[in-house]
Design a protein with these regions (language model features):
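Intrinsic-disorder/low-complexity, polar/charged segments enriched in Ser/Thr/Lys/Arg/Asp/Glu/Gln
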Residues: 41-43, 74-76, 104-106, 116
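Histidine- and aromatic-enriched segments that form or immediately flank copper-ligand environments
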Residues: 54-59, 83-101, 134
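Extracellular/periplasmic metallocenter environments
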Residues: 99-143
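Beta-strand-rich interaction surfaces with strong enrichment in secreted/lumenal proteins
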Residues: 64-67, 94-98, 108
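Solvent-exposed, conformationally flexible loop/turn segments
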Residues: 69-72, 100-102
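Extracytoplasmic entry segments of secretory-pathway proteins
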Residues: 1-67, 71, 143
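Solvent-exposed coil/turn segments that connect beta secondary-structure elements
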Residues: 49-51, 72-74, 80-84, 93, ...
Length: 143
């Protein structure tokens, strides 16, 4: 075949490879951000059980159904369940992690705005699942 050029095919292959490299780099960067828990993040133990949440701060303070945190500070949640599978969700901050009996799962977040936010269970956990809610109170820093 005289006069046939492979130039368009090579351009197409190069563009596809460049796009794949770009998507891979973006995905790696996003995963690194999600998995990297900032140093100094306060640990809060989150325990799910039918049909409420309990929260325990590093200083031993315990809260049931509501969680008080400070704006601009990083928090690491250690999430567990006492009975069945639940799913810890703070929709406004895109926090979502399963609470599994016998296992501790971790997720972190740093609240950016003062206010109230819903905490809910996103995994069907029994008859009163619809009522397994809590409230996150993001408050001004006390220091």
């Amino acid at each position: 075949m005289s006069g046939h050029s492979n130039y368009p095919e090579w351009i197409y292959v190069a563009v596809v490879i460049a796009l794949m490299a770009w998507v891979g780099a973006e995905a790696w960067d996003a995963e690194r951000l999600v998995e990297h828990i900032p140093e100094g993040a306060e640990v809060i133990k989150v325990t799910a059980q039918q049909w409420f949440w309990t929260f325990e701060h590093e200083d031993g303070t315990k809260e049931i159904g509501e969680l008080h945190v400070e704006v601009g500070k990083a928090y690491k949640f250690e999430i567990m369940s006492k009975d069945v599978i639940h799913s810890f969700n703070i929709h406004d901050y895109v926090v979502l992690m399963d609470a599994v009996p016998g296992r501790v799962n971790t997720v972190w977040f740093a609240p950016t705005d003062v206010g109230e936010h819903d905490i809910q269970c996103r995994e069907y956990c029994g008859l009163i699942h619809y009522n397994m809610r809590g409230t996150l109170y993001v408050e001004e820093s006390s220091t």
